[in-house]
Amino acid sequence: MKFTCIDSFCGAGGLALGLKRAGFEILVSFDASAPAVESFQRNVSPNCLHARAEDLTGRRLLSDAGFEGVPDLFAGGPPCQGFSRQKRGAHLGDARNGLVLEFVRLVSEIKPRFFLMENVEQLGKKRGKEFVDKLNAELAGYELHPFFFNCADYGLAQTRVRFVIVGKSRKIKAPFQLPAPTVKRWLTVGEALADMPEPPADSSVHPALPNHYRTKVTAINTQRFSFVPQGGGWRDIPEELRLKCHQRVDVRSGGWPDVYGRLRLDGQAPTITAGFDSFTRGRYGHPLQERALTPREAARLQGFPDDFHFCGTRRDVRSQVGNAVPPPLGEALGRAILKTLRNEQATYKPRV
């Protein structure tokens, strides 16, 4: 028996890859980014639409999937930059958060047995309460299971915390249980990158590994970074070499602790963002070399296999890697949902 899924706001395909590993058949996907769609089609499935959510309907998605009936899962991670840590005040009215409402609309139209929404940590906190309340009101036919995940608990060498809502149709009687951690000990950066060869010095792509290339660094930044030990940051740089803004900051204040940060081999990476290719944007410095992470290294820390080829410009690739749902997290969530669907099928009644 096949279990079916429609994947929305799919990006390069991290969530879909995890759901496929769990056992779902991905019927159709969509994203507004052409390079992300190209990556998805190359690595996950050719049936991926280059389209905006606002221009799609549930009927259109089911038609493009060639599917009649009720899909088992509607999944996605709609962007909502308005829920950033820096943003204050009301958030649901922020135009940047409109896509989460498009996600709700498509769930209402498609009426899947389950839905899965992955998003930023802040959406599940106080500033996201208005959205969660709206979700409860508009999707009253679903039993909601909101929770937070630390991706390190699911096999990543990264302490990425995400907010996830799983909605189960109230027609399903079998209980849903949140996925338990899949590892007893957190993977370290050193273990994750252990066999990774050094990227070419001229910033070209490594001949054996797609997307494995270094970002060019100025001589002064290379010199600054050479003083930073594993786990260190800008405060380890001699004062005469620091940026002027760092010279004016009291070291004891702890300002910008991750800028010029170097990863520890025996620790975990922070959240991988689209800025991972520069140690001036955060703790993305290689543990042993005077450079930032390559896209391939960042993709490993996100849980992607080495043969997953990200398409587009280097800027496109950064965005796809940093914005991806880690495949191991998608797989853990998919297995938990499938367990409920299989229990329903075996214990209660056949699907219709």
What residue spans do the PLM features occupy?
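Extreme N-terminal starter segment of soluble prokaryotic enzymes
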Residues: 1-5
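A short, Lys/Arg-enriched amphipathic alpha-helix followed by its capping loop at the start of a domain
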Residues: 18-25, 43
